[in-house]
């Protein structure tokens, strides 16, 4: 995206909340495919079949968000979150116990790739400053979230043994912070997550430590860092595959009669023009 750092790795786009990258990704994958994946990850809320879902146009509860994010920590296995796992009587006898229903929705390599990319949020992105201020030094994958009027803030934090989500907001959207400086997820929700995790780490009986690390799947081949330094902007020439970026083709001799007939949505994004996502 021109004016936003040129070509960006997905890890960096997530780390710095570069939303046009998310829009382009859904444009390439197709909104219907993204919605189907969300359904596989336990999301039941209504989702519009257009590119606005990249910007958070759907009202998804923190409950369903956490179920989806925890799938990445479980290496592709979705486990429906439960409010109550076990009920015991006064003598400790188990009256009822919920057995988790585990469903594989993606392979471990893809799930870990998401973990790898979201680690940038905590390491050097939107969550890094607050985590450092709180003295939390652990392997964390996460994502901050903020509504455009600063009335809602989120942070989903994934550690190797625990996924936790925090939402701060109001039922009445007219109530909000004056600025994103105070109203962003990294300032509203992340501190709550941090205080909670410090309590978790302090309780040794839980077996959760800041020294825990994510285990890489055996078939995980690494990242796309070899693409850095190739030059150009992500919006030059429209959407391209990795092979097309590595091995660009020479432009063909075209009369260009239809070049401007259907203007690419990415050009509008780069010029900050209004977009009709229902076309």
Give names to the regions the model predicted:
Residues 28-30, 107, 276:
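Poly-acidic low-complexity segments
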Residues 218-279:
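Low-complexity, Gly/Ser/Thr/Pro-rich intrinsically disordered linker/tail segments
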Residues 1-74, 117-120:
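Active-site-adjacent helix/loop patches that line small-molecule binding or acyl-intermediate pockets
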Residues 12-16, 61-62, 66-67, 71-226, ...:
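A penicillin-recognizing enzyme superfamily signal
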Residues 44-54, 190, 194-196, 237:
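Repeat-unit-sized solenoid/scaffold elements
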């Amino acid at each position: 995206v021109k004016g936003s750092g040129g070509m960006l790795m997905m890890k960096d786009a997530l780390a710095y909340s570069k939303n046009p990258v998310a829009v382009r990704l859904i444009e390439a994958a197709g909104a219907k495919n993204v919605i189907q994946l969300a359904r596989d990850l336990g999301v039941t809320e209504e989702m519009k079949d257009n590119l606005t879902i990249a910007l958070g146009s759907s009202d998804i509860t923190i409950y369903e968000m956490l179920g989806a994010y925890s799938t990445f920590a479980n290496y592709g296995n979705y486990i429906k979150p439960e409010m109550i796992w076990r009920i015991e009587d006064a003598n400790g006898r188990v009256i009822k116990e919920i057995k988790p229903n585990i469903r594989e929705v993606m392979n471990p390599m893809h799930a870990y790739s998401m973990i790898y990319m979201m680690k940038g949020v905590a390491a050097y992105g939107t969550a890094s400053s607050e985590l450092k201020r709180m003295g939390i030094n652990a392997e964390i994958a996460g994502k901050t979230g903020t509504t455009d009027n600063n009335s809602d803030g989120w942070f989903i934090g994934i550690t190797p043994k625990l996924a936790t989500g925090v939402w701060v907001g109001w039922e009445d959207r007219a109530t909000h912070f004056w600025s994103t400086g105070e109203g962003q997820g990294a300032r509203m929700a992340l501190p709550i997550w941090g205080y909670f995790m410090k309590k978790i780490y302090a309780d040794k009986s839980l077996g959760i430590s800041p020294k825990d690390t994510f285990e890489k799947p055996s078939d995980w081949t690494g990242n796309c860092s070899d693409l850095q330094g190739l030059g150009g902007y992500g919006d030059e020439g429209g959407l391209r595959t990795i092979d097309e970026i590595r091995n660009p083709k020479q432009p063909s001799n075209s009369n260009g009669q239809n070049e401007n007939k259907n203007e690419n949505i990415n050009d509008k994004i780069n010029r900050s023009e209004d977009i009709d996502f229902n076309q």
